């Protein structure tokens, strides 16, 4: 199956069975460039926020993972100021059996359960580990400022 057929199938599957609190689709006519949105999980400091992501599929998708970046600023130990996401399935744990829907759900999980032991932003990870209340307060503040 060509990458464009696979991406079109995932788009149709997403339309039929969208993951909870996520949406995604192509930007204009470009099947290889999508925009997604994730609602901040209610049990996280990101509750009430809507976070936008940019998704670029490589031409050899699904054999290579999509490039997914936050375009909304977010305070998180695994997401840096450029919107890069530290998530194993977007790197060495990628498998062609994974879909964009599963990727979005994994990113949602990351918002609820950060991984401070594999941080992209060590300073935030340190605050997360030593002063969780301060971390949550700052994350809520950023959510209000950038994602509401």
UniProtKB/Swiss-Prot annotation:
Q: Which organism is it from?
A: Saccharomyces cerevisiae (strain ATCC 204508 / S288c)
Please provide the record's keywords in A-Z order: ATP-binding, Isopeptide bond, Nucleotide-binding, Phosphoprotein, Stress response, Transferase, Ubl conjugation, Ubl conjugation pathway
Where do the catalytic residues lie? Answer: 86
Q: Show where the UBC core domain sits.
A: 2-148
Q: What is this protein called?
A: Ubiquitin-conjugating enzyme E2-16 kDa
Q: Which Pfam families match?
A: UQ_con
Q: What does the record give as the function of this protein?
A: Catalyzes the covalent attachment of ubiquitin to other proteins. Mediates the selective degradation of short-lived and abnormal proteins. The RSP5-UBA1-UBC5 ubiquitin ligase complex ubiquitinates RPO21 forming 'Lys-63'-linked polyubiquitin chains.
Q: How is it modified after translation?
A: The N-terminus is blocked.
- Which chemical reaction does it catalyze? S-ubiquitinyl-[E1 ubiquitin-activating enzyme]-L-cysteine + [E2 ubiquitin-conjugating enzyme]-L-cysteine = [E1 ubiquitin-activating enzyme]-L-cysteine + S-ubiquitinyl-[E2 ubiquitin-conjugating enzyme]-L-cysteine
Instruction: List the molecular function annotations (GO) for this entry.
Output: ATP binding; proteasome binding; ubiquitin conjugating enzyme activity; ubiquitin-protein transferase activity
């Amino acid at each position: 199956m060509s990458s464009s057929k696979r991406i079109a199938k995932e788009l149709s599957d997403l339309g039929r069975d969208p993951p909870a609190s996520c949406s995604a689709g192509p930007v204009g006519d470009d099947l290889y460039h999508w925009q997604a949105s994730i609602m901040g999980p209610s049990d996280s400091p990101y509750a009430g926020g809507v976070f936008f992501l940019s998704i670029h599929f490589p031409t050899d998708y699904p054999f290579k993972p999509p490039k997914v970046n936050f375009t909304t600023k977010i305070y998180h130990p695994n997401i840096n100021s450029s919107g890069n996401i530290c998530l194993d399935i977007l790197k060495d744990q990628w498998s062609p059996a994974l879909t964009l829907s599963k990727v979005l759900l994994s990113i949602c999980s990351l918002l609820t359960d950060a991984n401070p032991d594999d941080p992209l932003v060590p300073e935030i990870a340190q605050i997360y580990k030593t002063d969780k209340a301060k971390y949550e307060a700052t994350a809520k503040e950023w959510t209000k400022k950038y994602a509401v």
